[in-house]
Regions:
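Short intrinsically disordered, low-complexity coil segments enriched in acidic
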Residues: 1-2, 145
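N-terminal regulatory/effector-sensing and dimerization cores
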Residues: 2-99, 133
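An amphipathic alpha-helical interaction segment
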Residues: 103-158
Length: 158
């Protein structure tokens, strides 16, 4: 599922219980993720991942402009199918050798989006405006596959 969220006003910290994983992009404003008293800011132009479970977040609009984000929600099964397709269909060598304390100890990860990612989310934004995904699961799966490929193809951010 691909969704665009637009938040015109600051509404404070909200609790979310995600039943799916999510990869998102902050189009405008900033997102704050809270762990106890610690706030992690995710600024405009940043890609983020949030795992399943409870999250405490706040979406902060820019001065006079809406907060905007685009989020891809997916299950572990969907990700498995996409990774299998990329591995078998395109002989992509997929490994999980990334390891750093920042990524392992949190249920979210964020990093600045590359120009390719910004262009990708710009295209997705236009597709959402044109309502291209509402009745077309194939288009949504293709975009999700493209997103996963782009993430795998870039260098580690840490």
């Amino acid at each position: 599922m691909i969704v665009k969220y637009v938040q015109p006003d600051r509404s404070g910290i909200q609790a979310h219980n995600f039943t799916r994983h999510s990869i998102g992009y902050v189009v405008r404003g900033k997102k704050c993720v809270y762990y106890g008293d610690v706030c992690h800011e995710i600024p405009q132009g940043t890609l983020f991942y949030m795992g399943m479970g409870n999250h405490y977040t706040e979406d902060v609009p820019e001065q006079g402009k809406n907060f905007e984000q685009i989020v891809f929600y997916y299950t572990s099964d969907q990700l498995s199918r996409i990774l299998n397709h990329l591995s078998v269909g395109y002989q992509l060598n997929i490994t999980n050798d990334h390891s750093c304390p920042n990524c392992e100890n949190q249920s979210h990860v964020s990093y600045p989006a590359s120009n390719i990612m910004k262009n990708f989310f710009g295209t997705v934004n236009q597709y959402l405006k044109d309502d291209a995904f509402s009745q077309d699961n194939t288009a949504e799966t293709i975009k999700m596959t493209e997103l996963i490929y782009l993430i795998l193809a870039q260098k580690d951010c840490c």
